Amino acid sequence: MLKKYQTLLLPLLAAISGLVLGAIIMFIFGYDPIWGYEELFYSAFGNIKSIGEIFRAMAPLIFTALGFAVASRAGFFNVGLSGQAYVGWVFAGWFALLNPDLPRPVLILGTVVIAMVAGGIAGAIPGILRAYLGTSEVIVTIMMNYIILYSCNYIIRDVFSENLMKNTDSTINVSANASYQTEWLRALTNNSRMNIGIFFAIIAVIVVWFLLTKTTLGFEIRSVGINPTASNYAGMSAKQTIILSMVISGALAGLGGAIQGLGTFQNVYIQSGNLDIGFNGMSVALLASNSPLGIPFAAFLFGTLSVGAPGMVRAQIPPELINVVTASIIFFIGVKYIFELFLNSKKVAKGAK
């Protein structure tokens, strides 16, 4: 019975353990953890606008988490989600700024396609290097993050035309036709920044789940991730599958970046560092055990922590401590074999009886 629910229990235990460890750390430093968590969850769920902001924060995380999950199923540890998301944001935003008067359906579809193409190309590069040269994907994707970061910053500052710029570091806002925000969602959520990106994310979850579990390509991705040599003997192309999985991974991350840019911020601006949605997306995927259907629930938790963190100030707790809670959750994901050992020992003990 425990094994049947182990996939669900382990992430749940990791999340609860992270919250408990966060509470212990707050207590050690002289803060009231109960009051802190009360304010955190009140800030996250106390009004409809905050709930809208949770769904706004979820959408890009779902996309980057799905991207990480696809690559992981192929045995590829994609640390380059931040760069892939940023390049998707920049090129989708550029297209939107250059064509402000196109019909809304054309602009939205155009930004989606361009973001996915840009992210897919960024993902293909480390995939090709891994498949044909055997390079370490971790090192390559980390370095790609910085190559893309500074290249995109250069494009914004020196390539974008002056009429697109509000100042040296930021563009003007995209037109209403290109914005992922809608009047009816703003009215529904009391002017939150919730946008159509959340609906794209739900569709993506279903598509990726179907791809990985019900298609030949999904079987090949999982097979290559388990044993590329055996997959080659079975007639599959491990190299082609690795590259294709990274293209899909990068495309998903690129669309996540576009949703962050055109849904949350409405413009394009120079970044001082890698996008948070990349590394947080990795955390979401790990918490969900790379399950497409589990990712929205993990993203909801991270969205709640993100939106509720400022409320901890009312409990006189530095909002930065929410990062400690998040890190604690990831820590317990990393040592989840302890939970597995515990659950398995229960099973063995039961069998011995």
Predicted feature locations:
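Short, non-helical or kinked segments that cap or interrupt transmembrane helices
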Residues: 31-35, 72-89, 129-140, 220, ...
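Transmembrane alpha-helical segments in multi-pass inner-membrane proteins
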Residues: 247-327
